[in-house]
Amino acid sequence: MIQKETNLVVADNSGAKKVRCIHVFGGTGRRYAALGDQIMVTVKAAVPNGVVKKKDVCKAVVVRCAKEQRRKDGSYIRFDENAVVLLNAQGEPRGTRIFGPVARELRDKRYMKIVSLAPEVL
């Protein structure tokens, strides 16, 4: 469950390390984002000479969420941290590598590029 002001880890090599959620897409009063949902983030910490800089605002998709989420088969999926992958205007990942596992829900939401770059899909 990601909401405004939530701090997240970036799971790609776009140059950002830590980001903060500033908006949840998907309706006027939508409060929470879960696995596979798009959010607007601002970069709070970045590596030098990266693609994105500190204070940049960009879209991101949630790939790991600490709050458990129920699946269709009745099982639950939960991760140790909240993590996102930064997206460009076309919805493609800005980085060329993904670090750590990603959730299977991204395949259902048609983020095939992220799923193919990820080392593990849970």
UniProtKB/Swiss-Prot annotation:
GO biological process, one term: translation
Keyword Ribonucleoprotein set for record: yes
UniProt record similarity statement: Belongs to the universal ribosomal protein uL14 family.
InterPro entries: Ribosomal_uL14 (IPR000218), Ribosomal_uL14_bac-type (IPR005745), Ribosomal_uL14_CS (IPR019972), Ribosomal_uL14_sf (IPR036853)
Gene3D superfamilies, sorted: Ribosomal protein L14
UniProt GO cellular component terms: cytosolic large ribosomal subunit
Gene source species: Chlorobaculum parvum (strain DSM 263 / NCIMB 8327) (Chlorobium vibrioforme subsp. thiosulfatophilum)
General function of this protein: Binds to 23S rRNA. Forms part of two intersubunit bridges in the 70S ribosome.
Pfam families xref list: Ribosomal_L14
PROSITE patterns: RIBOSOMAL_L14
Cystine pairs: none
Superkingdom as given in the UniProt entry: Bacteria
Binding partners and assembly: Part of the 50S ribosomal subunit. Forms a cluster with proteins L3 and L19. In the 70S ribosome, L14 and L19 interact and together make contacts with the 16S rRNA in bridges B5 and B8.
Keyword presence, Ribonucleoprotein: yes
UniProt name for this protein: Large ribosomal subunit protein uL14
Keywords: Ribonucleoprotein, Ribosomal protein, RNA-binding, rRNA-binding
SMART domains given in the database record: Ribosomal_L14
